[in-house]
Amino acid sequence: MIIDIFNEQFPYMVIDDYYNEEELRLIWEELDFLSYPHKLKRATKESGGATGNTGELLKKNFHRYIDEIYCEREMSNILSVNRKLFSNDYEILRQHPHWFFQNIKFNRDYTQVGYYEDNDHYGEHRDNASVSALTWLYKEPKKFTGGDLFLSSDKIKIDCVNNRTLIFPSMIPHSVNEIHMNKENPSRGHGRYVITQFGAIDTRKS
C-alpha cells in the first residue's frame, strides 16, 4: 500500500496497491457475480444518480448499492474486505495530517459498485456524505481509455489506475470523463469498475 498525501485547496489521499492479492481475488469473485444487466443496472434519478441544476441526469453507468442486497455484511466479499478503511481507529485516514482526516468519524457507511463501458461518464457533482473513498479496478490488460476523475472546479486530474483508491471530502465537486472501449474487444466486464465507500454521520444515532 503506497499512500500519497495532498493538501492543496483541500485535503485528499491517493493510495496505490490498496488491496492485497487475496483481497483482490475475493473482490473479483463478487464483481464477476454482479456483472449482469439484471444485477448492475443503468443509473437513474430514482436509484440515486446525481442530477444537474435543471434536473438532467449526470450519471451514465451501471451501478448498485450492495448493502441493500445482503442481510448480513459478512455474506459479501466486498463488504468484508472494505472494512479496512475504518480499522484500527481509522488508521488509514489518520495518515493525512489535515484536521479533517485527523478528526473524522462515522456512524454510518454504505458501498456502491459502479461499472463504466463505452461512452459512459459522470458529470460534475457532489456526494451526499462526509467522506468518499473510490477504488478503481479493471481487468488487465486495460481495454479502455478515459475514466479518469477530476476533483473540484480546478479539474485536478486523478488517473484511473488499477487498484488505486482516492479518498476526499464528499462535498468536493468531482467528475469522470468519458470511457472509450477498445473496439477490438468491447466485451462486457472489461470496462472500469469502481467501488465507492461513503462515510457519513447520522445525527439520529448520536
Located regions from the model:
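Non-heme Fe(II)/2-oxoglutarate
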Residues: 1-98
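Short catalytic/ligand-binding loop motif for oxyanion handling, primarily in non-cytosolic enzymes
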Residues: 22-24, 105-107, 120-123, 143, ...
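A short glycine-rich, His/Asp/Glu-containing loop-to-beta-strand
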Residues: 100-115
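A structural signal for short, well-ordered beta-strand segments
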Residues: 111-113, 133-135, 195-199
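Conserved short histidine dyad/triad with adjacent acidic residue
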Residues: 112-127
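Catalytic core of Fe(II)/2-oxoglutarate
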Residues: 129, 140-206
